[in-house]
Each structure stands twice: as structure tokens, then as C-alpha cells.
């Protein structure tokens, strides 16, 4: 599209104006092919076609030139960054890995190709600051698949289907007698290789226990866990690392911005969006097409590389 050149006549075009645009665009395209310029010349018109011109076009079996009522640069004339969208259930860790790898600060969340929200580096940083809510993992409806992937673990009892929907996340740092006082049914307990602690958590109806340091889990504990409907995840990391990582398994939908999103359409004029972009603190702005499908992202920097439409005026 950057190589498009529009050949256009005056407003309220007559037959001469229309035929001039068609013939000159044809000539330029022929010369462009021979000279290997790569430019594409498109005949256009700045008004509606009268009856005389319609008759001439029909007689010579020519299509009417493209109607153009405004040649101001549009969003489609900007280099739109094709940032791939992610699913709302993707973990914060995976979203961060994508942003770090692509060197970007925001990602669009899509549902059926439509924009559902935006997750930014700031949102991920905010998720790390809420350290006093030990139920946030269940409030976010975190999937067990995300949990296992985030802590590089293995589910050795139970399956990956389902979500951690209720309960606290606790670390079994005390002896079993004290554990009985703070573990509640449906909790998730992070612990080590102590048999007594594992057994206590299961008997207290924990929903899941996370065994750290890749410790071996005995057959007795596995059997007890199956009988109580308790999942067992084994992670190679130490307790501190698991405790830090596990919150990064939460889905991005819990932290993404969904309200007051500033989006632009591919047909919007650059003049109209510049002022909006200047007043908003957002780094990136999502672009959608006429069907509302997500196309990509632009930033203020993209406006610096704007290439205006090229015209040839004829009559």
C-alpha cells in the first residue's frame, strides 16, 4: 500500500476527467512494470459519475475509478505493529515472557478475534504488590495447568483440568500440630519432603499440596491424596521460589484493563487521532477493522514514520 499512487481529476468529474485518470494510470502502470519501479497507479475520482460518463465506461467495458472523498492520511497509512493477541486464560508469567521477548510493554487480550482487554507491564508489576491476600490465586480462578507450567512442576496425583477456585495458599513452615490450626479445607499448601506435614495437609482436606525440591512422594501419601481428592504437584524449585512464582500463574484476565480502552479503526484519520494520543498516558493503542476485529497496535512513535498518500492530478 505504501507504493500506491492515486491518479485523480477534479471534483464533480466529467467524462474527460474520468477517462484521463483511467488512461494515465494505465500508462504509468505499464511504464512502472518495464522500469521495475514497483509502484501501483490507481485511477480514482473525486465525485459521482454522470450519465454520459457511465455510458462511455459501459461502452468500453471499463470499471468506474475508485471513489475518494478525502485524501488525508489514515491509520492504514501508518505502520501498524502486528502484535499477536493472547487468550484471557494465559498466565502472567507467559504474558511477561512474550513482552520481554518482543520488547514491548503491552499485549492485547482477544476473544473470537475481538479485543477484550489490555495487559501491561505495570499490571503485572501490580499483581506482585498485593502480597497480603493469600486467596488471590483462587479469586483469579487460576487453572491448575497454569500453576504446573509456572513452577515447572508435575501433577502426580489428580489431573490438570479445573481451576483453583477457593481456598488460601499457605506454606507449611510449622510442625503438624500448628498446621492443624491454620489449614482449612480447599487450601493449597506448599511444603517440603516431611511425611508428617504432607499427611497433615491431606487429612485437613487441602485441595492441593505442592511438594518442593523435587522430593519423592511416598506411595502412602499418594494413596491418601487420591482418597481425599487432593491433588499433588511436585516442583524442582525450593519453597521460596515456588512461593514467589505461583502468583505468576494467575490468568491475565484478572488484571487486564477492560474499561475505557482507547481504540482506533483502520479508517480513522491521523489528524483526528493525534490529539487523543497526545492527551492519553497509554503507550500503545489497539487498532480494529470495520468488523471490530483486532488488527494490531500503534504508538506515538509510529506517527513519525507516517507516509502520506501520493497523488497525480489530471484533467
Which residues make up each language-model segment?
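Short, ordered loop/turn segments at secondary-structure junctions
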Residues: 10-12, 46-49, 112-114, 121-124, ...
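Short glycine/serine/threonine-rich phosphate/pyrophosphate-binding segments
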Residues: 15-21, 198-200, 218-219
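Short hydrophobic alpha-helical runs that function as membrane-insertion/retention elements
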Residues: 42, 65-67, 107-108, 189-191, ...
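Short, glycine/polar-rich helix-capping loops at beta-to-alpha or helix-loop-helix junctions
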Residues: 51-53, 216-223
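Bateman/CBS regulatory modules and CBS-like beta-alpha motifs in cytosolic regions of diverse proteins
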Residues: 66-98, 110, 142-195, 200, ...
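Short beta->alpha transition motifs characteristic of CBS
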Residues: 104, 108, 114-130, 237, ...
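Long, charge-dense
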Residues: 133-134, 222, 227-257
Amino acid at each position: 500500500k505504501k507504493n500506491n499512487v492515486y491518479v485523480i481529476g477534479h471534483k464533480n468529474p466529467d467524462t474527460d476527467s474520468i477517462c484521463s485518470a483511467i488512461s494515465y494510470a494505465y500508462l504509468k502502470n505499464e511504464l512502472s512494470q518495464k522500469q521495475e519501479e514497483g509502484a501501483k497507479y490507481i485511477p480514482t475520482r473525486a465525485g459521482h459519475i454522470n450519465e454520459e460518463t457511465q455510458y462511455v465506461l459501459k461502452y468500453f467495458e471499463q470499471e468506474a475509478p475508485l471513489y475518494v472523498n478525502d485524501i488525508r492520511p489514515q491509520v492504514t497509512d501508518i505502520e501498524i505493529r502486528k502484535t499477536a493477541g493472547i487468550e484471557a486464560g494465559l498466565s502472567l508469567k507467559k504474558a511477561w515472557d512474550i513482552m520481554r521477548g518482543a520488547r514491548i510493554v503491552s499485549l492485547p487480550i482477544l476473544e473470537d478475534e475481538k479485543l477484550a482487554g489490555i495487559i501491561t507491564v505495570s499490571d503485572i508489576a501490580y499483581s506482585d504488590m498485593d502480597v497480603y491476600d493469600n486467596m488471590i490465586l483462587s479469586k483469579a480462578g487460576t487453572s491448575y495447568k497454569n500453576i504446573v507450567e509456572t513452577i515447572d512442576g508435575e501433577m502426580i496425583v489428580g489431573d490438570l483440568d479445573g481451576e483453583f477456585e477457593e481456598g488460601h495458599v499457605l506454606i507449611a513452615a510449622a510442625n503438624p500440630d500448628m498446621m492443624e490450626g491454620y489449614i482449612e479445607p480447599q487450601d493449597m499448601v506448599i511444603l517440603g519432603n516431611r511425611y508428617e506435614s504432607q499427611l497433615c495437609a491431606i487429612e485437613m482436606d487441602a485441595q492441593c499440596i505442592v511438594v518442593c525440591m523435587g522430593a519423592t512422594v511416598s506411595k502412602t501419601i499418594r494413596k491418601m491424596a487420591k482418597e481425599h481428592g487432593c491433588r499433588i504437584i511436585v516442583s524442582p524449585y525450593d519453597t521460596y521460589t515456588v512461593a514467589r512464582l505461583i502468583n505468576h500463574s494467575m490468568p491475565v484476565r484478572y488484571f487486564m484493563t477492560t474499561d475505557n480502552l482507547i481504540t482506533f479503526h483502520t479508517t480513522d484519520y491521523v489528524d483526528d487521532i493525534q490529539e487523543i494520543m497526545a492527551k492519553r498516558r497509554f503507550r500503545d493503542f489497539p487498532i480494529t477493522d470495520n468488523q471490530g476485529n483486532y488488527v494490531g497496535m500503534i504508538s506515538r512513535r509510529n506517527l513519525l514514520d507516517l507516509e502520506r498518500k501520493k497523488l497525480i492530478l489530471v484533467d
